[in-house]
Regions:
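RNase H-like, Mg2+-dependent phosphodiesterase core
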Residues: 1-211
Length: 211
């Protein structure tokens, strides 16, 4: 279970930072920054991947009420322009800036740090080790899932309500059948390939219709 040992080694306030959505073919990458309260930390915080959706939603609500939370969102078109690595770094930077308070130290999940002026420590597997990072993982994951569920209503053919933009079989089939949407990351190889195939199908069908 994540703990506060890393936080206690750092000057306060300490923010934990994590992201959700580096791997999907569609939708934004979302980062969250969380400064936990001195008292009243919600119980049950863990790596978001270990929690069911309902528990993530419950904890996210509690964290927004009890902790200081910042969220950074970088959309698909900017991911294509920057690449996913730099888009993730930007989302993390935006999340810390959105805290409304400058942390004395930042704990970041992973092995890379954004180019910012904050004293920071990267912790591999930090969402399973640091309570602040775990809290950020919950907020980032729930926030991104909520965004993708809203997009799913407008684009039901891609099955985003189930796959949240990841490369599930139904999503890949829909990409081939319908082509990419404006929310797809066209710099990602499966999306680029599907776009080329779809354009080819349209071209052939157009020639058939005109012939």
């Amino acid at each position: 279970m994540p703990h506060l040992r890393h936080e206690k080694r750092c000057p306060a306030p300490v923010a934990g930072v994590d992201e959700a959505g580096r791997g999907p073919l569609a939708g934004p990458v979302v980062a969250a920054a969380v400064i936990l309260p001195l008292r009243g930390v919600p119980r049950g915080i863990d790596d978001s991947k270990k929690l069911p959706a309902a528990e993530r939603a419950r904890l996210c609500g509690l964290l927004h009420r009890r902790a200081r939370v910042g969220i950074g969102i970088v959309e698909a078109d900017e991911i294509d322009r920057l690449n996913i690595y730099w888009a993730t770094m930007k989302a993390m930077t935006l999340a810390v800036e959105a805290l409304g308070e400058s942390p004395a130290h930042v704990l970041v999940d992973g092995n890379r740090l954004p180019r910012w002026g904050h004293p920071a420590t990267a912790i591999v597997g930090g969402d399973a080790l640091s309570l602040s990072i775990a809290a950020a993982s919950v907020v980032a994951k729930h926030t991104r899932d909520t965004i993708m569920l809203a997009h799913a209503a407008a684009h039901p053919q891609y099955d985003w309500h189930a796959n949240k933009g990841y490369a599930a079989p139904a999503h890949l089939r829909a990409l081939t059948e319908h082509g990419p949407s404006p929310l797809h990351r066209r710099s990602f190889a499966p999306v680029a390939r599907a776009g080329e195939r779809f354009a080819d199908v349209l071209m052939r069908s157009g020639h058939t219709a005109s012939g």
